[in-house]
């Protein structure tokens, strides 16, 4: 894969007050604002608070927060910020492969994997929908960790009776399959997600409701064990192992029972009662089983369609969808990454952004923002707005590149994000170069107080994808957010 760089008028025109972008169907003119007198800190904070309240209160009854890249965009933080204004926060797909890092009001860090990010807010009901897969030991491990830190979970979490159970055997199979593929690693988290969804699709999986029928639970689990043993030589299976697992799940069944509910009914009744629901997506659109960089994808649908199938609510009930996009791009594991940076440039973003997986701890691959991939995500999901995260990480760069288009080896420009990986691996990325900024922006809370070049960057993204940026992250804390 090669790249080319387009000279951009922004570098020369910054601060001139003139339009920085050519007029045309894909872009509107952007002008830098005239110089302003300093605003007293108290007035600035009050104005920012009012703007934030207006922005959040205007969200629709059922809203969603979805990842628009390859995950790790910072979805959990936005869900945590928005959750107090919603009655319910719901997860619709995925499992413990999703890692959401959030901070409470005291700055304490919580790494969540299956429990929805709304759990830190006492008045919020958290729902794990039918589209998710549940590793019960891991689920209780999360709950125990939260409660040991003073977060009450009892009576605040509902788990769908239709959700599929993820067993340790699925995790074992995940590792065996990855080893079998040798050099063609997909980059699985080895949490058993893919094998569990495989069991679901082949219709021999067990669901949460099966825990209510322990008289037949062992026979159903035996089928899963035998299937794994017949497929993988390295999988150890015995009747004694099956018996141990059944006894273990008898105890889990008793503890899980208070959490189990028909969440499809609960959510639809809540919609009738005008309660507000915030949907928290796991992973991201570029990892979608249908629309991502297949086969280097997850096993569920982290795009807008997964909300309906993963929660059992009608498409017409869904209103605002917020796409979360990092100010640059990262991905964990294998797979195409057209704008990836190598060497010192990639290391600089990785260190500044602390780009190490919440779930795996693996260093993330880093690169420039890919507008082609972002437009693909916006098209599929119909985002009403974007949350641009980690803008502060770009501080200190003399220039910032944005991948705006792909060119094929024959010189033809691609009109869309290709589904063919061979094509994607060979594209040439065409970049625009924008001026960077040197100041630390982590304490900025008003959009008009950002450096001129930072505002240019935000507005150019809006122009290129045709979706407004309403939220801008400038640090990890829940207060490090600008409402635009």
From Swiss-Prot:
It comes from the Eukaryota. Pfam families: Adenylsucc_synt (PF00709). InterPro entries: Adenylosuccin_syn_GTP-bd (IPR018220), Adenylosuccin_syn_Lys_AS (IPR033128), Adenylosuccinate_synth_dom1 (IPR042109), Adenylosuccinate_synth_dom2 (IPR042110), Adenylosuccinate_synth_dom3 (IPR042111), Adenylosuccinate_synthetase (IPR001114), P-loop_NTPase (IPR027417). Signal peptide: none annotated. Mg(2+) binds at residues 72, 99. The active site is at 72 (proton acceptor), 100 (proton donor). Residues 1-44 form a transit peptide. Substrate binds at residues 358-364. The keyword Disulfide bond does not apply. Pathway: Purine metabolism; AMP biosynthesis via de novo pathway; AMP from IMP: step 1/2. One of its GO terms (biological process) is 'de novo' AMP biosynthetic process. Coiled coil: none annotated. Its cofactor is Mg(2+). GO terms for molecular function: adenylosuccinate synthase activity; GTP binding; magnesium ion binding. Binds 1 Mg(2+) ion per subunit. One of its GO terms (cellular component) is chloroplast. Belongs to the adenylosuccinate synthetase family. Plays an important role in the de novo pathway and in the salvage pathway of purine nucleotide biosynthesis. Catalyzes the first committed step in the biosynthesis of AMP from IMP. Homodimer. PANTHER family: ADENYLOSUCCINATE SYNTHETASE (PTHR11846), ADENYLOSUCCINATE SYNTHETASE 1, CHLOROPLASTIC (PTHR11846:SF19). NCBIfam families: PRK01117.1 (NF002223), purA (TIGR00184). This is Adenylosuccinate synthetase, chloroplastic. It comes from Zea mays (Maize).
